[in-house]
Amino acid sequence: MVLNKVTYKINAYKIKEEFIPKEVHFYRIKSFVNEAFNFYRFVNFYGGMIINKKDKSFVLPYKVDNKVLKYKDGNNEIPIDIEYIKSLKLEYVKPEIAEKLVRGYLKSVHKIEPELSRIIKNIRKHKVVENIKVESYCEYEVKKHDGDYYLILNFRHTASITKHLWDFVNRDKALLEEYVGKKIIFKPNPKVRYTISLVDAPNPQKIEEIMSHIIKYYKWSEDMVKSTFGEIDYNQPIMYCEEILEPFAPQFCNLVFYMDELDSYILKELQSYWRLSNENKGKIINEIAKKLRFIDNTPKELEFMKFNNTPLLVKDVNKNPTKIYSTNTLFTWIYNQNAKIYLPYDVPEIIRNKNLLTYILIDEEIKDELKAIKDKVNKMFRNYNKIANKTELPKFNYANRWKYFSTDDIRGIIKEIKSEFNDEICFALIIGKEKYKDNDYYEILKKQLFDLKIISQNILWENWRKDDKGYMTNNLLIQIMGKLGIKYFILDSKTPYDYIMGLDTGLGIFGNHRVGGCTVVYDSEGKIRRIQPIETPAPGERLHLPYVIEYLENKANIDMENKNILFLRDGFIQNSERNDLKEISKELNSNIEVISIRKNNKYKVFTSDYRIGSVFGNDGIFLPHKTPFGSNPVKLSTWLRFNCGNEEGLKINESIMQLLYDLTKMNYSALYGEGRYLRIPAPIHYADKFVKALGKNWKIDEELLKHGFLYFI
């Protein structure tokens, strides 16, 4: 495979030698600690890493002269006796451990975080719209690349109420208690969100300690504290949060929220502040870097591979395979009689040549538009059904099934449909008036319809009525096809894997057991084979990959023997899983590979280009798509192979990145032109969507999932 190469700058800056430790030092906790002692939190506070949980050994990026370290446990400061084990030159430490120790060195010894906080506040002023404030905060990590250590530097945004929390609740403790369970930020460090768990009695001494911490650690002056928070109220209650033991004072905190909770006008105004092109974001990051003393201020230039725009396969009217390079013209024949007709590559047997009972559900607030709505629906379904009659596609039988519904009376329309329902797979097209505040404006209606085995798709009339060129109609049809399990296209060439599986974990209810996650199984053609919920052995238990493999083979009857299998997952392989995976690969005589794909990461590429990928250190930087306001790359952090009882770490390369790019095209829920495919490969994208649907209490229909129906999208 030959890929073109391009060069772009990324947000990586070489760390100066004087800010990198020469040696690291190993210690062990000597004294007894109680069961409440949080070993991870203790080591992380001092910028180190755990080596062995059992014998309480850890490593620090600096030498400790005093053999007693302090551990804060609520109100108490506990002395922890430690003993020295050995020292080791940093160059002899594994890169993934060394990176974290260099980060800990910058954090604990050189106090990089308060310095970044001061710099970003000077460079990027906050924005206020009505009572909502958006401000920027920095984040960072350390990566080793070609023998040098680099600081990966980025900034994000957080939105909060302008008033501090104590004023927001009108200095009323009872009202503050109503916000237990809500998210807050600690004003001097807005990048971390905390969840209020307890509102306690006032404690002036703790208020003084919090103030002292702000002044000493974050380098705020007393005048800055007063100008930001006003006169300090020493009689305010103390709060505790789920994430850490330290107390909080509401006067130093702000209530935060999610973007979908905002009024649309406020959201639009704030988006103009935080939606930046990659080039503009790069300029701001460079400004921050120039003021940071730990690094060279020139960003790293990196060579990227430009992925090939490989074709997809559909079928022509003679059912012969034909190539396409984008999917946005698949249904042009609905509106243009001269357009080429494309047929799907695979139709599930359970709906093949079926007449689907179809309901047209119209929001009663747009009943005056009935004539125009009927024209749109008739044109789409009549033209579609003409073609479907000559193929294996299902037909939509919607005659005399036009109904009005009210969003205030979902029960009424469900009751009406239920009275004439025949217990077969049906379809409903929901035509709505407007987008309501909840994420999916007709989610309740769609879920209740699906309880009756009616798969549905919604569209806003306000948008559809303006669709003169048929783009929205085309998109609507592919969404309907995907929900009905129709695989309209496949990859042009087979992959080297028998199965490519996307794995995501989460919470949901399945039967009488807790569902721990979902695996979406694609075959070698890039086609969805099935969607499989995974039950956990016990409620709340984390899913381990070896258990998932056994579950797929034993409970889901997927043949895993003598196969070449690729797992894509959003998360790391735990050490405890590795030995089991080696054993399973030996028992099954199968090659099992796992790639960790991280959507949330700190990398930024200073370009609007897309369809590109590179390797930095041991990370893959993967940027398959574009957006109008700056695309975030995906990080490929680990690629492991388990074969015949052996484990091998693989290096991210051109071939695997090209395959992952090809899989971003396998989007059965939207039509896009080149460059507007999925951000992550389809198997893990749909696994994530299914887990989110479980969290919203969508019903699980195993029969439909076996055929790859995306009814939950």
Swiss-Prot record:
User: What happens after mutating residue 438 to P?
Assistant: No guide-independent plasmid cleavage. Decreased guide-dependent cleavage of tDNA
For this protein, the Enzyme Commission number is: 3.1.24.-
GO molecular function (one): RNA binding
The entry's stated outcome for residue 483 to A is: No guide-independent plasmid cleavage. Loss of guide-dependent cleavage of tDNA
Region ranges (Binds 5'-phosphorylated end of gDNA):
457-460, 625-632, 678-679
Question: Where do the annotations place Mn(2+) 1 binding?
Answer: 504, 570
Spell out the catalytic residues: 504, 541, 570, 688
Arranged from A to Z, the UniProt key words for this protein are: Antiviral defense, DNA-binding, Endonuclease, Hydrolase, Manganese, Metal-binding, Nuclease
Give me the ranges of the annotated region Binds 3'-end of gDNA: 213-218
Co-factor binding details: Also liganded by DNA. Cleavage probaby requires 2 divalent metal cations.
Per the record, what is the consequence of mutating residue 572 to A?
Loss of guide-dependent cleavage of tDNA when gDNA starts with 5'-dT but not 5'-dG
Provide the effect of residue 246 to A. Answer: Nearly complete loss of guide-independent plasmid cleavage. Loss of guide-dependent cleavage of tDNA
Thermal activity profile: Optimum temperature is over 75 degrees Celsius for DNA cleavage, DNA-binding occurs below that.
Q: What is this protein called?
A: Protein argonaute
Origin organism is Methanocaldococcus jannaschii (strain ATCC 43067 / DSM 2661 / JAL-1 / JCM 10045 / NBRC 100440)
Task: Supply the source organism's classification.
Answer: Archaea, Methanobacteriati, Methanobacteriota, Methanomada group, Methanococci
